[in-house]
From Swiss-Prot:
It is found in: Cell inner membrane. CDD domains: ABC_6TM_MsbA_like. Residues 23-304 form the ABC transmembrane type-1 domain. Keywords: ATP-binding, Cell inner membrane, Cell membrane, Lipid transport, Membrane, Nucleotide-binding, Translocase, Transmembrane, Transmembrane helix, Transport. Homodimer. The keyword rRNA-binding does not apply. It comes from Acinetobacter baylyi (strain ATCC 33305 / BD413 / ADP1). ATP binds at residues 368-375. The lineage of its organism: Bacteria, Pseudomonadati, Pseudomonadota, Gammaproteobacteria, Moraxellales. Residues 335-570 form the ABC transporter domain. This is ATP-dependent lipid A-core flippase.
Amino acid sequence: MKQDFKVYVRLLSYLKPYWGIALLVLVGFGINAATEVSVAKLLKYIIDAIQEGSRADLDWFPLLIVLLVFFRGLGLFMGGYYTAVISRRLIFSIRQEIYAKLIRLPSQYYLDNSSGHISAKIMYNVEQLTAASSESLKIMVKDGLITLGLLGYLLYTNWRLTLCIFIFMPIIGVLVRKASKRMRKLSIQVQNTMGDVNHVVQESIGGQAVVKSFVGEEFEQKRFYKSSEDNLKRGLKMVIVQNLNSPLVQLVMAMAMSLIVWLALRPQILGETTAGEFVAYITAAGLLAKPIKNLTDVNEKLQRGIAAAYSVFELLDLPSEENHGTQTPKLQGDVRFDHVTLEYAGQVKAIKDFNLTIEPGETVAIVGRSGAGKTSLVNLLVRFQEVTSGSLYLDHIPIQDIELSCLRQQVAMVNQQVVLFNRSVRENIAYGQLEGAAEADIVAAAKAAYAHDFIMNLPQGYDTILGAQGLNLSGGQRQRIAIARAILKNAPILILDEATSALDNESEHFIQKAFDEAMQNRTTIVIAHRLSTIENADRIVVMDKGQIIEQGTHQELLLKQGAYFQLHQRNFEE
């Protein structure tokens, strides 16, 4: 419970920027609470006036009723509207904070968590969290003020009789506490299963071509049915707890009301109480049932929100990528791996005691079988992964001493899996730090990547929207857009991770010529299975199981007739 309180206090801290609006919420619901108490008071005056036959007083009551309803509506509008304003702004600000954290988390987080579960946190969980911090607060303020107002009126009218209500409060407290624990557990399960649902949807949509080609529609439908069914079952269990708790609380309140009515009818209790006072008291006691019911019902929203808050705050409290570097050098492209080891979870070593020096402007090709550690090696250069032991130097500076954004601004990378965004061709080439690049530079980069001609044949040329992942383009065209992006960056270090593997022979020929020129005076690391693309590299490094087993020029390695020779023969046969 102490931990829950801390979480709720943290939730409420998000309301600080909106304290002025929150004050209007308090005023609005305060007016509404006053009208609830006034209903009982008005009944007292009406009944007493009727008994006394006071015609002058009776003439005012219609106007008072209209005023009462008007102010009640005004209070509800103020409270409801400004609560909604806070709620929507909270969703906006928390989502911004989560997204800012997500894009700064280490790459390992994305390897350990599915995209479906991640998106569920930013969409579904934030909505649930807002229910705790704003919607629940709305009910607690509105019905809390009504409850306090009615209890105050009851105590003022007959404090001895009102104490009967407090006798039943511990029973209500026990019911709410037990329901809270159960609903918290179920809320976490509902959120997890919602992540599973999102995961299945994103996988099937992203891999729709594979689903169709392997006739996997029925299989994916079953997967979606199972994950949705799990979510449904846990949701229904929450409904059972919620709907069982509410009638039990109402039963306890009915018992309290019955006791009050029974005692109120005793002559010794009635005393000199007027009919108006008696009816007003019973009315106020009856009006108390609804806000108390609402306050117990809000517990379900509160528990869902707190469960979501644990999930959201857990993400927000994760450490961002380490960026303790303070140096911002203009790199020349000198790279040195000094006894570098990269170890994954489970003590699996992707790189083992690796030593390699690359001179500025040198083109080094790294080849090897799948799983040899080639991609892991280049990931270290942009700190997508961190060195487990040993040291990595750029221009004789330890890589961790270089400020992270400065480092990445000076490394251009064409990934094995091309990533394009649902934006224009121009925006995809001039992406990120390249935004605002001159049109002439963008066109020059596209021409160097032999992309300009096909871009000009698109419906709107450089303004053509590519669609999700650029699926409107062929594999070779997507690859050339990515290469144009890397060329435009004009970084001192260029990494080509199997960059020409998706190109047809003609495109590969032209792009290889473009790269031969682009690689001048630039340190280039090329990873490729198609060995024909790296024959002109200054040096070829052959890796196996995270270690260098051979290195030299193309001709030198062929003469050795070792591992590279075997890879070359296999490529030639293919």
